[in-house]
Amino acid sequence: MGMSFSHLLIILLIIFVLFGAGKLPQVMSDLAKGLKAFKDGMKEDDSTKKD
């Protein structure tokens, strides 16, 4: 079972309520940085397996 659009909308609404409009851009920025670091780490892991 994947996430449907309604599930994603509910999660975003909960995040908005918890953090408020003022902190939301900072939270999204931190989340994006974390995802980028995770992807970079996965790429490094793949390159070490090939060696």
Curated annotation (Swiss-Prot):
- Cite the Pfam families for this sequence: TatA_B_E
Q: Which Gene3D superfamilies match?
A: 1.20.5.3310
Q: Where are the transmembrane segments?
A: 1-21
Q: Name one GO molecular function term.
A: protein transmembrane transporter activity
Is the Membrane keyword given for this protein? yes
Which InterPro entries does the UniProt record give? TatA/B/E (IPR003369), TatA/E (IPR006312)
One of its GO biological process terms is: protein transport by the Tat complex
UniProt keyword Lipoprotein, yes or no:
no
In terms of domain of life, where is this protein from? Bacteria
Compartments where found: Cell inner membrane
Membrane topology label: Single-pass membrane protein
Q: Which keywords are on file for this protein?
A: Cell inner membrane, Cell membrane, Membrane, Protein transport, Translocation, Transmembrane, Transmembrane helix, Transport
Query: One cellular component GO annotation, for this chain's record?
Result: TAT protein transport complex
Instruction: Summarize subunit and interaction data from the UniProt record for this chain.
Output: The Tat system comprises two distinct complexes: a TatABC complex, containing multiple copies of TatA, TatB and TatC subunits, and a separate TatA complex, containing only TatA subunits. Substrates initially bind to the TatABC complex, which probably triggers association of the separate TatA complex to form the active translocon.
> Which protein family is named in the record?
Belongs to the TatA/E family.
Its job: Part of the twin-arginine translocation (Tat) system that transports large folded proteins containing a characteristic twin-arginine motif in their signal peptide across membranes. TatA could form the protein-conducting channel of the Tat system.
Which PANTHER family does the record associate with it? SEC-INDEPENDENT PROTEIN TRANSLOCASE PROTEIN TATA
Official protein name in the record: Sec-independent protein translocase protein TatA
Q: Record the organism.
A: Rickettsia bellii (strain RML369-C)
The taxonomic lineage of its organism, from the top, reads: Bacteria, Pseudomonadati, Pseudomonadota, Alphaproteobacteria, Rickettsiales
Gene this protein is translated from: tatA
